[in-house]
Structure formats: structure tokens, C-alpha cells
């Protein structure tokens, strides 16, 4: 069982609202289901097909159980934005931190763009 503090932070940060009023929120199980759905979508897209093998399904099921049991964690960005429309349209919304070598004005533009998306940038 998660501590009260962890539950408050999870509700505030990761559980997505289920209604327009923002009075009902995902449960931890629903949040993890959304994360697994996002991971499945990433896998299908990377493979270029929508059929996963039995081994891949088993890996997703194992990941889901580890996340539900709080024995493993994914990036906070994935908990927050995973399987949302914005994460599919703007992949940079999922960037957490990055590194670049700034040599030109174009590199500065890239850095500013990433910073505006909420991504930390080291250089």
C-alpha cells in the first residue's frame, strides 16, 4: 500500500481526470493500464505492425504487474502523458532530459524548443 503522501502526489500528478469537471480521476490500476497501452503503441509503431508476439504480450503483462505492485517504475512523463493524444501527436512532450552540443543558432533554437516543452537540456 502506498503512503498517503505518495497517493496525494499520484492523484495530483499522474491520475488523469475522467470527467470534464475534474472531479473524478483514474485509479492507480487505470493509470498503469494507460501506461501499458502506451508502451504497446510504441512497440507496434517501432515494429511497423499491430501484432505483438506471445513473448511481447508476456513482457507487457510482467511490466504491468511490476508497476501495479510498485516494484518497478517508468518515467514520470509516461505516467503523466502516456497514451494521451498529445503524446502521439507531439513526441517531444515525452522527452524528459536531453543533451546537445550548441554550435550554431539552429542548435539554440532546438534547445529553446525542448525547454519550452518542459525538457531539461544539458550542453
Each PLM stretch: what is its role?
Residues 1-123:
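Extended catalytic cores of very large enzyme megasubunits
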Amino acid at each position: 500500500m502506498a503512503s498517503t503522501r505518495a497517493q496525494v502526489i499520484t492523484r495530483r500528478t499522474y491520475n488523469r481526470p475522467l470527467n470534464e469537471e475534474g472531479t473524478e480521476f483514474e485509479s492507480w490500476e487505470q493509470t498503469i493500464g494507460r501506461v501499458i497501452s502506451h508502451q504497446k503503441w510504441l512497440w507496434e509503431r517501432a515494429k511497423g505492425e499491430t501484432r505483438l508476439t506471445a513473448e511481447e504480450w508476456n513482457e507487457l503483462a510482467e511490466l504491468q504487474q511490476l508497476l501495479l505492485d510498485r516494484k518497478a517504475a517508468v518515467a514520470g512523463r509516461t505516467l503523466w502523458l502516456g497514451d494521451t493524444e498529445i503524446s502521439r501527436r507531439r513526441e517531444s512532450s515525452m522527452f524528459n532530459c536531453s543533451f546537445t552540443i550548441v554550435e550554431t543558432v539552429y542548435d539554440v533554437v532546438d534547445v529553446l524548443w525542448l525547454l519550452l516543452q518542459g525538457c531539461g537540456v544539458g550542453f
